[in-house]
Amino acid sequence: MKKLLLCVPFLALMFQSCSNIEDEYMYDKGLYTINWEAAADSSSVTIINRFWNETGNYFNYESDGYDETFHYWPQAHAMDVLIDAYIRTHDAKYKDCFDKWYAGINSKNGGSYWNNFYDDMEWIALTMIRLYEVTDEAKYLDTAKQLWNWIKEGWNEEYCNGGIAWNHGDVWSKNACSNGPAGLI
């Protein structure tokens, strides 16, 4: 009897919480319309205006114009924004950054695309493949192939039944960040 008395209020509360399904979607009606093309254009221009390093031809890590710290792997994601913008608009201002960036990150990274972290090289390789697909310039594909050769060196089966290590010094660390992008390459 005690169980029944406990269940009745619980069931009443549960059924009371079930209301009109329309309540769930009341925000879909929206107060304004978003122009996604304009939003994409604005963000693509902003990444150049706020993060592009005119002197070094790479993307700064911060947008303040003072911190010109270079981080290898975010370069790929920033360039992917410009690739998407170019595909969408065919505006030459985006394509003009491709070759500059290619040379800039190589120079800033010590004259090489090699990096101690396999996942970092994977992101750059994926971007190089996209650059090749958009421009048909062999240098991008050749660089992606060179990166892939370095990345494959990270494979070992001694730990975790196989996979690509996170970095050259931690062969036992098999993270999703170093194996997921490799699967895409």
Question: How should these model regions be labeled?
Answer:
Residues 69-86, 116-133, 174-185:
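Well-ordered alpha-helical segments within folded domains of soluble proteins
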Residues 1-27:
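Bacterial Sec-dependent N-terminal signal peptides
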Residues 9-14, 55, 159, 172:
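Residues in flexible loops and secondary-structure boundaries
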Residues 18-111, 134, 138-161:
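Low-complexity, Ser/Thr/Pro/Gly-enriched N-terminal "stalk/linker" regions
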Residues 141, 148-185:
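Aromatic- and glycine-enriched pocket-lining scaffold segments that form the walls
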Residues 108-126, 159-168:
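Charged/polar, low-hydrophobicity segments characteristic of intrinsically disordered regions
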Residues 4-6, 11-13, 31, 82, ...:
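Generic detector of leucine side chains in alpha-helical contexts
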